[in-house]
Amino acid sequence: RLPADSISLRTDTRVRLHHGSGHWPARIVLMEGKSLGPGEKQLAQLRLEKPACIWVGDRIVIRNWPETVTLAGGRVLDAHAKNKNLRTAAQKIFLKQRAEHHTDASKWIDSQINRDGVGKRDGVLKPSHFYPTEIQMTVDDMIASKELVQVGQWIVKVDIWNNLRTQCASEINKAHQEHPERIGLVLEQLRPLVGSVFGQQNLFEELIADLE
């Protein structure tokens, strides 16, 4: 958010990002529009010129390049964002959900699984400003409430996993009906279907185990 007594901040402005006792040069890229007016707030990406150790959820301060004026304050919503994905619909939904619920671990976990389709149980929201015990308890609660399901080392949205199981079971039944003389469907034929849902994440073995 830009303070009410500030001047407008234009996209691609070179600034200094302050976090704790450190500061780093960066360029600020606004997600929408070319400038941010006084008192306004907006999602933006900071493209750092040097690596920085900042966790997801941490508060930051943005100062002008000469470091004479504080321009804005903010919170890190995605520490590993890719430039090419900045304005995609999935990334916008992901960032807005986190911005609107910055202290709710369940919303942050949900935002990641919604965007990526899957997450590692022991890696979700790590590192971040949420305590590890809080993250694990939140995941447990989301599994207990049938929002998520754990398959092997992964956590997945229950409806997505169930839909995938149903599709795979349908393909197996179809193969039995069309070719009753065969033992069954070659399970490797299901791999592309799993890949279409989870992309590069390999949950094929977990799915086969769940179908047995």
PLM ranges: what are they?
Residues 1-212:
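C-terminal effector modules of nucleic-acid-centric enzymes and ribosome-associated factors
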